[in-house]
Swiss-Prot record:
Oligomer status and interactors: The 4 large subunits of the cytochrome b6-f complex are cytochrome b6, subunit IV (17 kDa polypeptide, PetD), cytochrome f and the Rieske protein, while the 4 small subunits are PetG, PetL, PetM and PetN. The complex functions as a dimer.
Further details from the record: Heme 1 (or BH or b566) is high-potential and absorbs at about 566 nm, and heme 2 (or BL or b562) is low-potential and absorbs at about 562 nm.
Co-factor note (free text): Binds 2 heme b groups non-covalently with two histidine residues as axial ligands. Binds one heme group covalently by a single cysteine link with no axial amino acid ligand. This heme was named heme ci.
Protein name per Swiss-Prot or TrEMBL: Cytochrome b6
Gene: petB
Amino acid sequence: MSKIYDWFEERLEIQAIADDITSKYVPPHVNIFYCLGGITLTCFLVQVATGFAMTFYYRPTVTEAFASVQYIMTETNFGWLIRSVHRWSASMMVLMMILHVFRVYLTGGFKKPRELTWVTGVVLAVLTASFGVTGYSLPWDQIGYWAVKIVTGVPEAIPVIGSPLVELLRGSASVGQSTLTRFYSLHTFVLPLLTAVFMLMHFLMIRKQGISGPL
């Protein structure tokens, strides 16, 4: 094992990377509330794992979506547990994100020189809410259908661009297969990719600037 480690160490300088990660200064005022961002990240990773598992059985069509969710819950081994963990971690992610935003705001973590860190955090908050909206529709039950119809109908009130925007969201003039396809694509590909990119930016800036000091 030591020879294998030495081989990688010679090429990648693993020890130097580990020392840099573990030697980062942590201010003495840091408490448990500073862990809320990390908990949000953990919930996101759980979402990715459980969501990926469900894609093997879920069918994004208006005729089969609800039946496929029922199949996951009743027929698939541990499907009920995977979907339940997905739902619970989704709620936990939203809650932890809200508490994290409040903590950062109340402790002044958005002030100079951390404005861009705050901006990426706000973008991540919007993406988190978007996960909730798109994921809520995927079972395509009565609640999901009418939730999508209401949410996608909100932009109708915007002058000039309202109607085209509604059609863009729905994929057609009314809620249907095109809407479900778009929401599924957003929920399983577009939003996770954007979230991963902005999380990386967020963490790199935190790593560079460090944790904000006390008020």
